Each structure stands twice: as C-alpha cells, then as structure tokens.
C-alpha cells in the first residue's frame, strides 16, 4: 500500500455493501449522505476495475460455498483483494453484552482461502470494540475502521489509493485472549458488576502484569517512517508547585508526507502506594513532509505525577525520581529521561488498631510500650546464628526456625491484645491509638 488507481480490485464481504458505519440502538442516527464502497469506487475512481462478491452470510455464521466460490473467482482475477470483515449488527449492539471476542467463523474461513490464492489481501475491519486477531497474519494489511461514520467508504478509498496517509492510534489495548482481560474472572455477574482493576485500567493492567498483547494502546502505523530524537527537559529537579516543559524532535524519515501522534508517559512512580508502570500524560499530532523535523512540546504539572490521596482529599505527588517516556505506543517507548520531584506537603500520618509493633517502634513514644508488651508476651528469642543453622540443617525436622522477634514486629496492635489473655484490653488499644494520632 498504497495501490495504483488503475488496479484491478476484488471487493469481498457483505460489510462492503451493508456497511457498519455507526452503532445500533439509541446511538443510531440518519446520515445526511452515505455511499458504500462499491459506489465510491465507481463514482470517484473510474480507472479502478472493481468487482464484488458477498463471500459470507451476515445473518448466520455458516459457510456458504456458493458465496465462497464467487469470491475466490473474483479474487483470482484481481491485483488486490479488499476484504471487509467484522462484527455483524446482531453480534454487537446496544442492550446486550458480548460473551466472547471472536469474529464469525465463516469470515475467518474465507480469509484463509483468500490468502491461499497468493494475492495481496487488505482487510478493513469493522467493530465497535477489540476482537481476537489470531487470523491477522493471513492479511497483508489491516485497517481497524471501528464504526467510522457516514463517510467511511470515502476514507477507505483514500487510504487504499494513497490520497490519505493513516495516522490514527488505538485508544484501547487489543488482547490476545478473553482470559487475559481483567474482567474475565468475574464477568458475567447477575445484578452487580465488580470493577476490580482499581487504578490498573486498560494498558495499565497489561503493563503491570507484563502480559503480551495483540496490539497495544496507542499503536498505529503509517505509510511513512518516524524517528524520535533529542528528548530534553527544562529542569532536572522540580517541586510539586512547578511545571516541567518537555520537548523532543520528530522526523519524517520516509518517502510520503504524513502525521504522527506522539505520546508522552510518566513512569517509575515511587512505590508509596500501588501505581501503574506508566501513565499517558499527553499526546499531540504533528505533520511532516519527507525529511522534515518538527519539535513537539508538552507541559507537565503536579497532576501529571500525582495520585489521589484519600486522607488528604487532594492529589499528591510523592517525592522521588520519575521517568519521562516518549513513544509511538504504550509498548514502543523511543526516548527516556528522569526528573526528581520534591513534595511540598507532608502526608498526615494516622494510625488505627492495626498499627504494627514495628511501626510503633519507629516512634519514640511507642518504643517503651512495645518493649513492655513484648516482655509481657514472653516471645522466645532465637539468635540469627541459631536460626540460620536450623534453616540449613536437613536433619533438623522441628519447625522452630521462625524468627519470633520478626513475627512480633509484624503483628498488629489489636492482635497483640487478642493474644494477651486479658492483659491488654480493647480500651487500652483505643487509648494507645488516640495518643498516636494526637
């Protein structure tokens, strides 16, 4: 791609005629103007010799050999196959949820047969959301059209013949399997839906799990090539009241003019709370002619580094070293830099009945309390030398190599009270907690 305007084109697939250009249900609107792909080719590209075959049934997931035979015959006489495949309206619409991510089997069967002919196969895929793409290796090119609106056929032709250069990027991750998605363990549920991802939504989940994906968040190709270089920060050390200016250069190293979406992520956040590996904090689109370089600029502030702290009722940026990452997708990071953040606010420390003995030992007022409780509880002491001997002695089968002192330091205050035989009451626990929070 792109193809010449004089190509012999075999357009195959019912979705080339009955185009899914919008959603169903309450989202359905009447278009002001709409043409299918065959009409666009006939009216706007008179030199293109186009044929059409339905190829598969849309209402039923059955292989129709008559449809298939016509499609294969047309494809054999063509220079390029334009195969329109995707989710029929009956498989994906308002009012019900999908139970799988598969495309209809009859469409995949036809793709395999078309690929066996040895002709270039360009797939235009129509879906409202990600689907499994284990069949994608059979296609020479794949355009994820989603439901692209009433002008989708015009856009398809412009992309096919090079009047437009693709520059879109995926706004979601396409997984390799339904079982890889975070909702797969709890969906479907009756009456309730539990969103268990927390802050690990979308690409954040797949990154944290270090899980391979079919196509990552932010992915998208072009007919030209792009080089990222010269990442620079205006400061190496900032406070959470400052802004940070990030710049980098983007060069079109290919042979066609085009647009590139540059993505900026912030990663390696300090681990005071569970955080994603990285998060998108900005993106911009630039146009470059072949050989041209453009400088792109991003401005980051406190929110770019922060998480919402429930106790503070505000966004909080922890002190520490963060990574600034520039890339073409969430899995294609081209440039990296680091910046040191200094928080100007101190998180108010609060304690409850689950405060551990180890935490109490870090407080001057708590050390005497802990020592008194440990003495009263009379935990047996095991020296480090003895503990190591028992851990490594294969003949010692007695399970006594536990470091009781370490176990005691991890014990919550309320559990010490439970195990004290009445020596420490719940009232005593409340008194200690109240004193800690003064």
Residue ranges and their predicted role:
Residues 1-438:
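C-terminal non-catalytic regions of proteins with extracellular/luminal or membrane-system context
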């Amino acid at each position: 791609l792109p193809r010449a305007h004089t190509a012999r084109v075999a357009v195959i697939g019912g979705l080339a005629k009955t185009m899914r250009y919008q959603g169903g249900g309450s989202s359905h609107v009447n278009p002001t103007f709409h043409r299918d792909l065959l009409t666009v080719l006939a009216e706007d590209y008179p030199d293109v010799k186009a044929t059409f075959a339905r190829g598969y049934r849309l209402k039923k997931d059955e292989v129709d050999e008559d449809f298939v035979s016509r499609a294969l015959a047309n494809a054999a006489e063509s220079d390029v196959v334009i195969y329109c495949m995707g989710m029929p309206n009956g498989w994906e619409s308002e009012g019900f949820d999908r139970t799988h991510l598969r495309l209809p089997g009859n469409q995949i069967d036809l793709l395999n047969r078309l690929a066996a002919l040895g002709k270039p196969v360009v797939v235009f895929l129509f879906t409202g959301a990600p689907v499994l793409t284990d069949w994608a290796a059979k296609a020479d090119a794949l355009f994820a059209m989603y439901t692209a609106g009433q002008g989708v056929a015009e856009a398809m032709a412009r992309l096919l013949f090079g009047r437009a250069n693709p520059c879109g990027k995926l706004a979601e991750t396409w997984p390799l399997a339904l079982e890889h998605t975070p909702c797969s363990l709890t969906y479907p549920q009756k009456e309730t839906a539990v969103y268990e991802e927390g802050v690990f939504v979308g690409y954040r989940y797949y990154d944290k799990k270090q899980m391979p994906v079919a196509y990552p968040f932010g992915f998208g190709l072009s007919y030209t090539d792009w080089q990222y270089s010269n990442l620079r920060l205006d400061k190496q050390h900032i406070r959470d009241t400052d802004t940070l200016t990030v710049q980098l250069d983007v060069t079109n190293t290919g042979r066609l003019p085009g647009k590139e979406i540059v993505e900026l992520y912030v990663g390696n956040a300090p681990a005071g709370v569970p955080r994603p590996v990285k998060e998108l904090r900005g993106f911009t689109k630039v146009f470059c002619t072949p050989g041209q370089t453009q400088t792109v600029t991003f401005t980051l502030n406190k929110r770019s580094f922060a998480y919402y702290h429930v106790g503070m009722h505000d966004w909080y940026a922890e002190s520490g070293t963060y990574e600034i990452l520039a890339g073409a997708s969430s899995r294609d990071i081209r440039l990296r830099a680091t910046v040191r953040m200094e928080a100007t606010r101190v998180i108010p420390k609060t304690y409850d009945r689950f405060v551990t003995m180890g935490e109490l030992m870090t407080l001057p007022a708590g050390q005497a309390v802990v020592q008194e409780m440990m003495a009263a509880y009379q935990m047996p002491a095991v020296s480090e030398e003895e503990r190591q001997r028992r851990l490594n002695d294969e003949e010692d089968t007695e399970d006594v190599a536990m470091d009781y002192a370490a176990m005691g330091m991890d014990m919550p205050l309320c559990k010490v009270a439970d195990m004290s035989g009445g020596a420490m009451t719940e009232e005593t626990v409340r008194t200690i907690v109240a004193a800690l929070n003064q």
